[in-house]
């Protein structure tokens, strides 16, 4: 499955504890990554600077649903279930 154009849910909903260029302490949940562009695409998608946790997250029908809102809901729910 390929990412839905204009979505960016996986770069917004989850917290990321790994450093990201421009976000050395990672990012909190429900906060857009600084590396998202105006089209909700990752500016460092093909860069070696992209965190491994980001590269390891793959689009799936379960996670992405049928809309950005469904993806945000699924990812925020997962974030709450896995928070320390």
UniProtKB/Swiss-Prot annotation:
It comes from the Bacteria. It holds the Pfam family CxxCxxCC. PANTHER family: UPF0153 PROTEIN YEIW. Belongs to the UPF0153 family. This is UPF0153 protein YeiW. The lineage of its organism: Bacteria, Pseudomonadati, Pseudomonadota, Gammaproteobacteria, Enterobacterales. The gene is yeiW.
